[in-house]
Amino acid sequence: MYDITLAAVSIGLFFYVGARAVLKCLFPRQTSFPKHVPVVGVRDEMLSITRASLRQLTNGITTLLDGYSKHGQRNRPFVLYDPSAQPELLLPVQHIRWFSEQPDSKLSSHGVRQERHAVRYLHMGDQVELESTTRFIRYASNDRLNRHLENLQGLLHDEVRRSVDCVFGSQRQAQDDHWKEINLYGAMQDLVFPIMCRVFLGKELGESDEERGRVLTVFRRYLMAMGISTIFIGELPRLLKGVVARVVRIPLAYYRSQTLRMLVPLVRSQLSRTKHDEDDDDERGSDFIKHCANLSTKSTLSGTSSEAGPDLIAEWIMMLAGSLGFAGSSSTIIQATNLILDLVNTPPELLALQQLRHEAERTLQDDSNWTQAASFRQQKLADSAIRESLRLHPILIKGLTKEVVTPNGLELPDDENTTIPMGSWVGVPVLGIHQDERFYPQASEYRPFRFVEQAEAARTQAGGGSYEDAPEAAKPTTTYLGFGYGRHACPGRWFAVLMLKMILSYVLLHYDVESTGPAPKTRVLGDAALPPFRATIRVRKRKLGSE
């Protein structure tokens, strides 16, 4: 009898805890934001918050723009639920500068990364301490991609030339005037990923093209698995994240082990080569592997850490692949796809492609120009075209998200003294701001030279007429948030813009491109804009001297 009673109590407790968990998932607590802050997307219906959250999976653009037009444009914050049933307060544009200046002791991105980026559930690597290693990688990538960016231009040019010609067509096509229809997103994947690997892993990825291709395939599969897992787990309610992550980690662990099996010997080989030739100035001595080793040695000499071996550096590269590597390559692929689609579908009377081609011919007259930073700084038209495409197609429709971590909450600088309680998520309605007619007339249209025209108009009013002061594509403002804003803006944005300029310049100088139909409308999964997977263009090798 005692055993039966104990079993009954145990079963009852099990179902009680399970029922509580399910109810918590289906009926999440109402937001504790002040009552005067409006909530967008929640209807008067059964399971209202759950259903509003589910709608955000595919209908996020409509809900965000509706909330922005009703509240954001009137300089009022509003609340939106994401697909995981997490409420987030979205700030009006006049609060963005103040928001970005708040210290990490008040607003932190740590908790957001743990949940929305699924770091808490997907991080692997027992010998890697997450936070300190993340700071180290951020410093190393900042140093590599920003301070020494010009040193990368030669190898970038070499890889862009090799990859574009491989994907777009051979020299023989110049003889028969052959047009080739390609899937643009797939083509950009085949371009951008090898370029990223060339920068971070160096040229010596294998002894043959076949081995190099095998290395790239393994690494690419890991990145895809990590990226899909991050988005999928990040959009789930907290109740389900841990459970589903246990299943997702199984294939992820397999791809991770395959990649490490390839990476560790590669790292060991390059470190050994570096030790035998400390004065090597060629590309083998400039890759990210050596850069990590050098920074590790400096830290060891200063007493702040121990020197990293091949296994640990391989882990660092895996972390880079899972954060900057995946985010950088995937976002650049989407940006490049959208940019070319926008340009080939620009009204022909604007002569956008012709003007960009002439600018590339003027700034890149020989191979030496490709290695000089000044050449691409002079490409104001390309800069404007890239900036305009990022404005129209931001990677995230809302962003800059942080969590209030101060116990007393955070008081907004508004007339109503709105206080946001601890634990709340706060962000910015990026797409709403980017499509605000107050900042961008005809905001729904792609106008490739919008920013040079604005700069030229401003200079004309001041007595000038040049567009040299047009804002750079990599420079965020409170109304241009394609790369984030403030001290936490994307660290690789200058590198990304340089890569986009190189790809665009090389394509226009060596190929004709044309549209196969209207560009598809942007779709989203949660906060993330999806790439136009099926969009195609036609390409043809240009004949020497042709217009």
UniProtKB/Swiss-Prot annotation:
Instruction: Look up the EC number in the record and give it.
Output: 1.-.-.-
* Key words of the record: Heme, Iron, Membrane, Metal-binding, Monooxygenase, Oxidoreductase, Transmembrane, Transmembrane helix
Name the pathway.
Secondary metabolite biosynthesis; terpenoid biosynthesis
Enzyme class label:
oxidoreductase
Reactions catalysed? isomotiol + reduced [NADPH--hemoprotein reductase] + O2 = 2alpha-hydroxyisomotiol + oxidized [NADPH--hemoprotein reductase] + H2O + H(+)
Q: Where in the cell is it found?
A: Membrane
Query: How do biotechnologists make use of this enzyme or protein?
Result: Fuscoatroside and some of its derivatives show interesting antifungal activity against Candida albicans and Aspergillus niger.
Disulfide cysteine pairs (residue numbers): none
Residue ranges crossing the lipid bilayer per the database entry:
3-23
Residues annotated as binding heme are C490
* GO MF annotation: an example: monooxygenase activity
Q: Which Pfam families match?
A: p450
Gene Ontology biological process terms, A to Z: secondary metabolic process
User: What does UniProt give as GO cellular component?
Assistant: membrane
The similarity annotation says: Belongs to the cytochrome P450 family.
Q: What role does it play?
A: Cytochrome P450 monooxygenase; part of the gene cluster that mediates the biosynthesis of the enfumafungin-type antibiotic, fuscoatroside. Within the pathway, fsoD catalyzes the hydroxylation at position C2 of isomotiol to produce 2-alpha-hydroxy-isomotiol. FsoD may also hydroxylate the intermediates 3-O-(beta-D-glucopyranosyl)-isomotiol and 2-deacetoxy-fuscoatroside at the same position C2.
**What is the protein's given name?**
Cytochrome P450 monooxygenase fsoD
Q: Which organism is it from?
A: Humicola fuscoatra
